[in-house]
Amino acid sequence: PLQYFIIEFLAGLGFLFIFLSFDNYYSIILLMVLFLIYLMILFIDLKHFIIPDILNYGIIVLAIIKNFLPNLDLIFTQDIMLSLAGGIVGYLSIWLIIYLYKQIRKKEGMGLGDAKLMAGIGFLFGWQSIPLVLFIASLLALLVAMPSLMAKKKGLKSKIPFAPYLITAGLVYFLYGNVIYKIVLVI
């Protein structure tokens, strides 16, 4: 089916980009495995509205391992305490949204898979990445959902998989996070 072609094409493009962008083999291997896990999560959540724990835990394990590999400090936070704080802040930021939504609406909203995914992003980039990643993900989700809502193709009660937006926001942070923060600090 077309979905398999798209996944394989994106995996190939991602691997090529990683291979051409980094010269440290530790970085290349780590980033390729992370990219593959994120790609699986993205498509599983799009299709089934779930994020398998095994994939989220894989990200967290890789995020912890990266603290002990050489020459990764330019890409990710390499301070184990910042990494741990990032995981906790990432998880709690989504957990708080889930909790408040349930208290206000009296029903389930997001799942804890999104919280675990955000924990993995926090473990990778540190706590300081969480506000920007969450903002970008929310903005992307809103921009994608608005046309369907305005055309009344979807209602406010429609399910929206959030992992693709968290993953995209994490990628934006990975590529442009420092630039975005410099722009924000100037403003």
Task: Set out the residue ranges of the language-model regions.
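Alpha-helical membrane-inserting segments
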Residues: 14-22, 65-66, 70, 93, ...
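N-terminal transmembrane signal-anchor/hairpin module of polytopic inner-membrane proteins
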Residues: 1-25, 182-187
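Interfacial loop-to-transmembrane junctions
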Residues: 111-113, 146-172
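Functional transmembrane core segments of multi-pass inner-membrane proteins
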Residues: 28-36, 40-140, 183-187
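Alpha-helical transmembrane segments within multi-pass membrane transporters and channels
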Residues: 1-2, 143-151, 187
